[in-house]
């Protein structure tokens, strides 16, 4: 296009008088028509070169062309800057509008949290409204805990909370600092139940350590990370040996708060008889609290027949020495663990237990425990009752133990299954801290 314009300029005689627009209107129209073929976005850059080609020997024309180019660049820069400014303003307006929409959906005159939840443990603290249920549609069934074939509530992360449930609401600060003052000792020792291991206390350990306690969780022989074969355990003393070794390593004047769950109650009772001076308090959590000359098997034979069918199917006897001899261990049917032990626990904890639980040695279960009032009876005992959702150690059995061997004080933990360290870790932690702060009894 630029070459054609230069050809037009060269054909004209430089000595020829410039015709007026009236006389040579056709020539002017032809020249204008040629210029109109140039796209509008290229005219600004071509016109200065056109004027330069017409008077290439004139320095004034050259200076004028340079100034024109400079003005064009400045004008282009100003237009680009104005365009960027308008674009930034538009983005700011859109951001402000989105923010207004967000805050308009959040109640301003309430203490409730925004509708963003990291935890999925409890989404609906109350039954959902009809509008919410309609919006959920096909997944509305997830709001109601499922039931197993035995009629027991399966583990569900959105179980509706009871009005008497002591656990904090999701929009409250669950890690709010507890004041720990006046504790006789700030060291806890946790003893797991039958089939469990130190791994089951991971939530409790975290919460207690956050409040300044020193916490030790023991793996009993053949449990947790112990490589010992449970079929070869022949006595209660052999089973609790790691716990006894722990007490042997304590300083002479050091005391601990001993906590046991399930069959761990019998194990801690054995240690209480041997190390009474090193135990400040003993806490039984839905645990076997045996009387003198009583075995854990004797205790569980008192269990009502209501859960007998499920209990019989959950427990699988192992006969390492042949079926003509007594069982050597008791294993679990993994498909029934949720119904029996963890019907209120989060699914992730149920999965952890299903791959971590190990058989219970049978010999310690049938061994009768011998305790004395002088040693075992001198230690302050506390019992934490799990309520109606505990099918492994029902409330009736816990009440029978409490009646026959009364502790100093009983605490109730509602809404928990047999594993409160999974289903109600915050509530369990508060009770443990509360017991730790109870002042020591004055000697008479």
Swiss-Prot record:
PANTHER family: METHYLESTERASE 15, CHLOROPLASTIC-RELATED, METHYLESTERASE FAMILY MEMBER
Primary site of residence: plastid
One example GO MF annotation: hydrolase activity
InterPro entries: AB_hydrolase_1, AB_hydrolase_fold, MES/HNL
Family, similarity comment: Belongs to the AB hydrolase superfamily. Methylesterase family.
EC assignment: 3.1.1.-
Transit peptide: 1-58
Disulfide bond positions: none
Organism: Arabidopsis thaliana
Subcellular location as annotated: Plastid, Chloroplast
Record's compositionally biased regions (Low complexity): 53-63
GO cellular component: chloroplast
Comp. bias regions, Polar residues: 1-27
Task performed by this protein: Putative methylesterase.
Encoding gene per record: MES15
Stretches assigned to the AB hydrolase-1 domain: 188-312
Protein name per its UniProtKB record: Putative methylesterase 15, chloroplastic
Organism superkingdom: Eukaryota
Biased composition, class Basic and acidic residues, residue ranges: 81-90
UniProt-annotated catalytic positions: 262 (acyl-ester intermediate), 390 (charge relay system), 418 (charge relay system)
Composition-biased stretches (Basic residues): 64-80
Signal sequence residues: none
Chain intervals for the UniProt region annotation (Disordered): 1-36, 48-91
